[in-house]
């Protein structure tokens, strides 16, 4: 944190009513509000790589706000006296006539949706710290070597020598829908002569260690788990699809046509996951810059993977359940049935829903990083969630009906009751991954610690589904 601002002129005459800002001196509460709010935006967004290289940004010495200019703008124009380039949130600014509202700022790539509300959370925390911690310090007897201070993100009360820990606030992650999944902590060291500076440079500025707030290890573990599990899933699914396509005795049977399309849907989802992660997400990915630009190409690819192919998974699972229930309920089927209506509905309806989703989101929430995250406008995301939940609910109902029909049919021989129930239970367990009922276990958004389990669970269920269908295919082929 090193924006240029003089601390000597920042010290207020009435020291009894001042708020301390680490490295920036003591300020009157109103001046503190303005300076700390500009600093909140600066520290959250303008130190990020893709903005740091494209824009000149610094805190204005008059504490009115933060100066933000494209790198190609002349210094004669880019200065704190030019209102066109000075931004702050009006309700926190010392003089709102000298700044432009922060929500008027437009950067390339775009800032997150409602970024000004994220900054406002930080500004409010700074104001609360000033009024409730920093000012009160001057009205009490306190011999602590480290005075209370606002460091730009967190509020620290006076401290004795040692390490002070503070929970990482959500706003430092720069996204309104990002929440810390467990308690990460920043730390600030208090020494006998005051708050510590980095050991390597005794003349350095006051320092808070926020490395404990970083989640890079979690992200890397999740990416690695995803790559490994979906690679295994694709490896298992490819031979399964080939077997269902090439085995003559079964390739034209309606039930196995459904199996084949379900596995193709799962295969495409896994393949697209590997493609998108390799192109956009991993370190040194060739198209990673498109994520920050919210490029149309990456939005399209992620929409196909995360919306269209996910919906096709659910529609083909539903098709499996509907066809099996119809088969058991009516005891009629045609060996030459092409299932054209199933194909049109299961591949077509998700396509229509996805196209509508893309159109609606582009009008109402056309921000974010390639739409990897859910839309911040909740009702838009329910366009995908509702049909998925509906498909799972119907599948759960049909699973119960199918088990009931199986038990009823198996009771024809009263002497084999234990075997009958064993067969019914085994049949029901085999149908769970085929119908996708296990997806109900992952509706809850797991903590980061459990996301690896979630990836393993999804991939395992796809692999188990392919194994079950291949085994049943082999049995059917051997009987034909």
Swiss-Prot record:
Q: Name one GO molecular function term.
A: G protein-coupled peptide receptor activity
- Tissue spec. comment: Present in the head body-wall muscles from the L1 larval stage through to adulthood. Also expressed between L4 and the adult molt in vulval vm1 muscle cells. These cells play a role in opening the vulva during egg laying.
Xref: InterPro entries? GPCR_2, GPCR_2-like_7TM, GPCR_2_extracell_dom_sf, GPCR_2_extracellular_dom, GPCR_2_secretin-like, GPCR_2_secretin-like_CS
- The secretion signal range is none
Q: What coarse category fits the chief subcellular location reported for this protein?
A: membrane
Any Gene Ontology CC annotation: plasma membrane
Q: Name one GO biological process term.
A: cell surface receptor signaling pathway
Q: Which SUPFAM superfamilies match?
A: Hormone receptor domain (SSF111418)
Q: Superkingdom, according to UniProt?
A: Eukaryota
Question: Where are the annotated glycans?
Answer: 95
Keywords from the named record: Cell membrane, Developmental protein, G-protein coupled receptor, Glycoprotein, Membrane, Receptor, Transducer, Transmembrane, Transmembrane helix
Lipid bilayer topology: Multi-pass membrane protein
**A Pfam family hit:** 7tm_2
List the Extracellular topological domains. 1-222, 283-305, 365-386, 445-480
Which spans are transmembrane here? Answer: 223-243, 262-282, 306-328, 344-364, 387-407, 424-444
Where in the cell?
A: Cell membrane
Similarity field: Belongs to the G-protein coupled receptor 2 family.
* Function per UniProt: Not known. Putative receptor.
Instruction: Write down what this protein is called.
Output: G-protein coupled receptor seb-2
User: What species was this sequence derived from?
Assistant: Caenorhabditis elegans
């Amino acid at each position: 944190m090193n924006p240029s601002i003089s601390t000597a002129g920042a010290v207020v005459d009435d020291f009894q009513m001042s708020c301390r800002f680490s490295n920036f001196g003591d300020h009157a509460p109103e001046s503190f509000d303005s300076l700390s709010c500009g600093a909140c935006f600066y520290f959250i967004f303008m130190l990020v790589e893709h903005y740091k290289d494209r824009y000149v940004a610094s805190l204005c010495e008059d504490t009115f706000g933060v100066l933000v200019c494209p790198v190609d703008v002349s210094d004669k124009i880019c200065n704190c006296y030019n209102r066109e380039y000075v931004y702050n949130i009006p309700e926190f600014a010392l003089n709102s006539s000298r700044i432009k509202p922060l929500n008027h700022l437009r950067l390339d790539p775009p800032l997150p949706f409602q970024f000004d509300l994220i900054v406002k959370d930080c500004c409010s925390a700074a104001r609360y710290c000033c009024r409730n911690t920093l000012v009160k310090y001057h009205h009490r007897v306190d011999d602590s070597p480290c005075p209370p201070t606002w460091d730009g993100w967190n509020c620290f009360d006076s401290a004795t020598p040692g390490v002070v820990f503070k929970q990482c606030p959500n706003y430092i992650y720069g996204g309104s829908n990002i929440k810390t999944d467990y308690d990460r902590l920043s730390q600030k060291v208090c020494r006998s002569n005051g708050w510590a500076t980095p050991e390597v440079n005794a003349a350095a500025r006051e320092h808070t260690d926020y490395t404990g707030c970083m989640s890079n290890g979690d992200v890397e573990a999740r990416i690695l788990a995803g790559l490994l599990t979906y690679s295994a899933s694709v490896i298992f699914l490819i031979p399964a699809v080939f077997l269902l396509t090439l085995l003559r005795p079964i390739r034209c049977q309606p039930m196995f046509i459904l199996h084949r399309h379900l596995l193709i849907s799962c295969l495409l989802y896994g393949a697209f996951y590997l493609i998108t992660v390799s192109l956009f997400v991993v370190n040194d990915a060739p198209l990673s810059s498109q994520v920050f630009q919210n490029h149309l190409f990456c939005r399209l690819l992620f929409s196909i993977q995360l919306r269209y192919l996910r919906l096709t998974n659910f529609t083909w699972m539903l098709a499996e359940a509907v066809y099996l229930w119809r088969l058991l309920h009516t005891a009629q089927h045609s060996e030459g049935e092409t299932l054209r209506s199933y194909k049109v509905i299961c591949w077509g309806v998700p396509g229509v829903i996805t196209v509508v989703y893309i159109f609606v989101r582009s009008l109402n929430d056309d921000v974010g990083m390639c739409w990897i995250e859910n839309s911040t406008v909740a009702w838009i995301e329910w366009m995908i969630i509702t049909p998925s939940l509906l498909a799972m609910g119907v599948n759960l109902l049909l699973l119960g009906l199918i088990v009931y029909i199986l038990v009823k049919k198996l009771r024809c021989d009263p002497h084999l009751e234990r075997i009958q129930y064993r067969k019914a239970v085994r049949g029901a367990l085999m149908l769970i991954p085929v119908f996708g009922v296990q997806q109900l276990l992952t509706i809850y958004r797991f903590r980061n610690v459990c996301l690896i389990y979630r990836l393993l669970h999804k991939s395992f269920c796809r692999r188990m589904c392919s194994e079950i269908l291949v085994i049943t295919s082999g049995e059917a082929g051997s009987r034909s």
